[in-house]
Structure formats: structure tokens, C-alpha cells
Amino acid sequence: MNTGELVDLGQQLRVDSVRAAAAAGSGHPTSSMSAADLMAVLLANHLRYDFERPAHPGNDRFVLSKGHASPLLYSAFKAAGAIDDEELLTFRKLGSRLEGHPTPQRLPWVETATGSLGQGLPVGVGIALAGKRLDHADYRVWVLCGDSEMAEGSVWEAAEHAGHEHLDNLTVIVDVNRLGQRGPTRHGHDLDAYARRFRAFEWHTIEIDGHDVDAIDRAYGEALSTKGQPTAIIARTLKGKGVKAVEDREGQHGKPLPEAEEAIAELGGPRDIGVRVHEPEAARALHSAGTGQTELPRYDEGDEIATRNAFGEALAAVGTARGDVVALDGEVGDSTRAEFFAKEHPERYFECYIAEQQMVAAAVGMAARGRVPFATTFAAFLTRAYDFVRMASISGSGINLVGSHAGVAIGQDGPSQMGLEDLAMMRAIHGSTVLYPCDANQTARLVAEMAGLEGIRYLRTSRGESKVIYGPDEEFPVGGSKVLRSSDADRLTVVAAGVTLHEALAAADALAADGIQVRVIDLYSVKPVDRATLRAAAEETGCLVTVEDHRREGGIGDAVLDAFTDGRPVPRLVRLAVTTMPGSATPAEELHAAGIDAESIEATARMLVEQAIVP
């Protein structure tokens, strides 16, 4: 398009943003209006995208990081012919695909859910990494950010990583409209303040007037021709551009324009400009979902193997069988054992350094490009990336997260390293799967299972060695459990997983020597939980004792209660968990101090029997 046509298209995008928000009675039209010219030039002159084939491997990828400006995105979809005007006016209404913030579960042209600011660029880095190192394709990744979100630390994790990886297929456009939600942003219209920061991370930067369509066009062309480094286009804009009543005025964020019809007239009225978006380059998917039978590692019963070791060996084996599996780690691969994958498949291993938000975001970006990512770090450090996990669920993203060094059983490193909240936070994620293996063969099987699941999958692994109690051919279906001790004379049931499963078995054997029979359930699938087995145990033994190397809130005890949320009577339940603040000690001392070792389980069972709390 020529200059006049681009100006007209920008005005159309503003008008349609105003109309959509007015029809909804809510939304963010002023945030959309500031970026309308930036979007118009990109859509008409530079984006290569087949809207009829959103999965085309050669399509450019666009991420609207400032997701509240969704009216602008939907107006662009209308201009490209992907939606019609009738659908545009369903914005924010019940049943509409056009939600307040865009999600890929509703619209196939959306790469990732945004709206929690500071996430679009990190995910865009993941997509760009896939393009450069995995797909070896010529597609471009464009990310439109707001200036307010430049205060987010995750943005600068992404900027540093993109510069380090020389992602010249990535362009970020920063819409510097000066105003955030409650008032001015930190740097206002100081474009150089943003440019200096990007340059410090080895980006090429371009500062422009974000309402000069010719300058925008030149900047995009310069970005496309820049080699060896990503490009940041810093654009000075005005919030509410084009409507005097709201232009560059505070207090106009997140609300429809009060006089929408007058605003539309001031913008020149509705238009019906259609954009013929450039076709993508021919490309093909280079990875395969499967190349052969997975030959998992096999461990002998009775051996002492850390589940983290089994995870690393199993992941390497799954990577051999599946070309779509990739691994990411937060610079602790020698501890998580992700290094085993790195040695076997270095071209599919991504070192993300101590930047857990960027690591999870990169996993989401790679999943958007059809990969099956496994992202690993200490369980405790995944808490830092929790909002990215939450948003990944909203995206419907399929990612595998693995948290090692879980619980007090890590010993002397102390509480800062102990993941004690991870089961709770991962169980709370919509549609998640949470797995906690107790031995090496179980771990290997569950890693293979995870690769074929949907949604957010979490595997909890342990630092210390544990005895192999299952054979290598044992099956562990997700949603299942294993009953390891059982008799007709069971007085109660102990439910455990991971480290405490071994403690429960030792306690059960000691009790059995004194004639007290105890059932033991290995609840390796913490979510979904095996309701049938738990209900049967409650009915047959009358009392459940849960034991977990985790906080009481949200972990195995609460997972067990989920089996009785359909109106069934809740059984007598005793919950042993970590309730104090641990310190530094040996693993055995830590487990005992927390009251979750074999001795504590045995004492609890004896108390229940001796005080006739259980029959």
C-alpha cells in the first residue's frame, strides 16, 4: 500500500477498535488507537501470513504482548478477511471468539494468550528460537509491546536471551504512548531510555514517530535486513490518537469512548478497506513426531537410583524416539540431569540460564511451533515462573515441567532450595497433570507418558537415591495408583508418593511385625487422582493417613480429598506434612523433624490403633 492507503487503513483500525469497544460496553480502545498505524503498515506491507492456513510452516508469527489492545488485533483480522464485521461487534460477549484478551484456544491466528503483561516478548523469543535453531525456516517473529510492560523483569530476561542467541528473525515493536493505566509510564516519551536498554543487550534499535507510516515502513524494512541481532523499533505514539477528547489524556484507559459516534466521525467514519496480506514463503515442517519405539532405560529391583537420574536418562531415550521433543534448563542441568538429553541431542537442547520465566516462556513458544518441550529446574525455582505456567494453561499450551530437589529430603541445602509448594501450585492449574514417582522404573515410564499428554504436565523428582521397587515392565497409567501392601485385616491406609512412599513401606513392615496390618497406596498420579482405589480403601479400612514431603496445603492430602467431592462421606483423614520452617540437616534428620519419616508414620498408626480411633 502507498502512504495514503496506509493512513486510511490506520484510521479504519482506530474506528473499528472504537466500534468494537462501544458495542461491548468495555475494552481498551485508546490503547488500540496508539498502535493502529504500526499495525496497519505491518499488516499491509510486511507480514507474510496465510489466514486460511494458520499452521503453514512458513507463516510469520505475530504476538500482541499488550493483549488488552485486542480490539486492534481483531480489527486487523477483519481487514485481512479472517473475520467479518458482524463478528467484530461480538467482542467481549458470551460465546464470542473475540475475548477481552486474545487466546489461541478461540482463534487459530493467535500464537499465545496475552494480557498478563511482560509475556509476549519472552514467548516470542521461544518462537524465534524454534525458527532459527529447529525449523531453519525464513519466517519472522513480530511482537508488539506496550511501554508500561517494559517495567517487567521478564521483558529484560527475554531481551538478554534474544541478544545472546543473535535472533535476527525477531522484531519487537514498542508502542511508547506515554500513558499506562493510572497515569504516566516510568520513562514517558523518552525513546532513548528504552533504546539504550535494548542496545545493552546487543539489539539493533530504531527510534521513530509511530504515526508516520513512511517512517514505520522504512523501520520494518531495516529490521528485515538486519543480520546477527534482533531489532527493537521504539515508536513514539499518542494514546487515543485521532480523537481530541481522549488523545494523550490521562484517565482514559480501559473504557469505551464516551461519545463513540462523534469519535468515529472525527476519525473519518467507517471504512471497508480489505488487505491482501503477503503470502508466506514455501516451507516444510522439519521435525517428526515419532521415529521409532522408545527404548526406555531399565533398572534392576533393589538398586538405589535417584529419580532425577532416571528422568534424565528417560528423557534422552524419548528424545531419540521422538524428533519433536526438546529440552530446556535453567542452568542446573547437571543437577536436574537434563544434561543427559543435552549430550544425546545437543541441537534440541536449550540452555536458558538462571531465568526461569524466560525458560517457561520459551517452552510455550516452542510448543506453539509443534514441539514437545521439557523445561527443568529445581522445584522451588518454578515458583518464579508461575504466572507463565498459568498463562500457558489459558493458551492451551502443551508443556512438560520437571521440578527436581523437591521437599525437605534434599537435606543440608536448607529451605531456600526446598520445593514445598510445587504440588499445590501445579494442581491448581486448569487441566494440569501432576506426577510424583518413587523409583527409577516408574519415573522412566511416566516421562514417556508425559510426552503424549495434553495441557500442563508436571513431574516431581528427588535428589537422593531411592530403592527400585518396581520392575521395568510395570505400567503406570496417568490417573492410577499402586496398592503395595494390602490384606483383609488392614486397620488403616497410608497414602504416599515419592520419598515418603519408601518411609510408608518401612513403617507398614514394622507395624506388620507387631500384628498391625496397614494398607499402603503409592499415589504417583497426584492429579488426576485414582478416586476408585482411594474410595475402596476408605470403605475397607475406615481411615486414611496421607504422608507428603510438601506443605499441608494443596498437596497429596488435598488430592486425596478430591476423591470424595461428589457428596460421598469424607473418611477419617490424618495428614502428615511439612508444617514448620525447616533448616539444614541430613535428609533423614529433615524427614524426622518434619514428622514424615517411617518412625513418625508408625507412631501415628499405633496411636490411632491404641486409642481405638480406628477399629
Feature roles, as predicted:
Residues 150:
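Short active-site segment of divalent metal-dependent hydrolases/proteases
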Residues 143-144, 172-175, 402, 436, ...:
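Residue-level marker for buried hydrophobic side chains located in beta-strands
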Residues 1-142, 272-460, 465-466, 613-615, ...:
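Thiamine diphosphate
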Residues 147:
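Residue(s) in the substrate-gating loop at a strand-loop-helix junction
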